[in-house]
Design a protein with these regions (language model features):
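Mid-to-C-terminal alpha-helical segments outside catalytic/metal-binding sites
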Residues: 244-328
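Glycine-enriched alpha-helix->loop->beta-strand junction motifs that scaffold or abut catalytic
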Residues: 94, 152-160, 178-185, 212-214
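Short acidic/histidine-rich active-site segments
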Residues: 99, 131-141, 163, 211-231
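Histidine/acidic-residue-rich catalytic or RNA/ligand-binding cores of hydrolases
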Residues: 109-111, 140-154, 171-178, 194-205, ...
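Catalytic beta/alpha-barrel core
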Residues: 68, 98-101, 159-169, 193
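Conserved, mostly hydrophobic/aromatic
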Residues: 9, 97, 135, 153, ...
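Alpha-helical scaffold segments that flank or form the walls of functional sites
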Residues: 1-16, 22-24, 40-47
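Acidic, glycine-rich loop-and-beta core segments that form the ion-binding/anion-interacting portion
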Residues: 84-85, 89-156
């Protein structure tokens, strides 16, 4: 997976994984009692790849622990408890917590408030902070429980919103998202496949961008939805082809946002927002990675101009000549 990501230009990944499977250690016929061994291997493989010649440019990966929203209270609490246990054992590998599954077929966030408050209380007692990165608003409704997940996600302090498809319908909420520096993780191909929109042309992301909402592109279950690779090329290509106002500069802004809002390290809410506001002017890991990205972006733009500049000039000249001929 890391090989595929790096080959596609992705240097950092915040993975989401639902822990509803048994993990078997190599050569063992009985599953592990918990996921500690899996995370041990996960961390070792990341460092092994980064130390290799092939992976020397890879920044790393962390995991957003993902629960299933349709489960009952006991199972969700047990899953949350397992998340806390792994965070205590491998704090550098767990970056946040989310609840996934079909939103309108599962429990809304307002129904899960007791479990979420219990989770936060347990984290505080253990002296750890596991922020929320909620899926919310992945729906067509307006005022439904699923749509209102957006409001609850913001009130619960989510740092990013997965999908946020229905956000464009709520001007006041848009202003809150902007004020709180919350990123919207948009997944165009997923939204098409799941029939939230007929094509990328009718996707609401351009409306959010026009209102100044910070957004990024994400792939959302590529192995299930048909991309069949871990990279981002398919979603970026869809966006480039579908939205004329976006262009190369717009794609660059979306990519930069994915670096700006990445969960590189544990930070409290105030430090998280401060570093996002500071961007490249800061002095932490986020600023360092954004500076690296900016250098590579400038190099990429230079390559585009060098490789295709003459062709572009020829096309512009041809367009002017055609226009003059038409006037004559």
């Amino acid at each position: 997976m890391m090989q595929q990501l790096l080959a596609d230009g992705v240097k950092w990944v915040d993975l989401r994984l639902a822990f509803i499977f048994f993990y078997y250690a190599e050569g063992k016929e009985e599953p592990e009692a918990n996921y500690e061994r899996m995370f041990k291997v996960f961390g070792e493989e990341i460092e092994k790849f980064k130390a290799s010649e092939e992976g020397k440019d890879f920044w790393g990966a962390r995991m957003i622990w993902t629960g299933i929203r349709v489960l009952d209270t006991r199972k969700i609490v047990e899953d949350m408890d397992a998340c806390i246990g792994i965070k205590l054992a491998y704090p550098h590998l767990i970056s946040g917590y989310d609840l996934v599954g079909q939103e309108d077929g599962g429990r809304p966030l307002k129904d899960l408030l007791p479990e979420l408050f219990w989770f936060k209380k347990q984290c505080a007692e253990e002296g750890i902070d596991i922020p929320f990165f909620f899926h919310a608003g992945e729906c067509l409704g307006d005022g439904s429980d699923t749509d209102q997940n957006l409001f609850d996600a913001v009130l619960l302090g989510t740092r990013r919103i997965g999908h946020g498809f229905s956000l464009y319908k709520h001007p006041l909420l848009i202003d809150m998202v902007k004020d709180k520096k919350i990123l919207v993780e948009s997944c165009p191909i997923s939204n098409e496949v799941l029939r939230l929109c007929a094509s990328v042309m009718s996707h609401p992301l351009p409306a959010l961008l026009a209102r100044g909402v910070s957004c990024s592109l994400c792939n959302d279950d590529p192995a299930i939805l048909g991309q069949d690779t871990a990279g981002m090329t398919h979603d970026f290509w869809q966006a480039l082809q579908g939205w004329d106002n976006l262009g190369l500069a717009g794609l660059g802004s979306l990519a930069e946002n994915s670096v700006r809002w990445a969960a590189f390290e544990d930070q409290n809410a105030a430090k998280w927002v401060h570093d996002i506001k500071e961007a490249t002017l800061g002095n932490g890991v986020r600023a360092e990675k954004m500076k690296q990205w900016s250098v590579e972006w400038e190099q990429f733009c230079l390559w585009v101009v060098t490789e295709f500049g003459d062709d572009g000039e020829s096309i512009r000249k041809l367009g002017k000549e055609t226009s003059l001929d038409a006037q004559d």
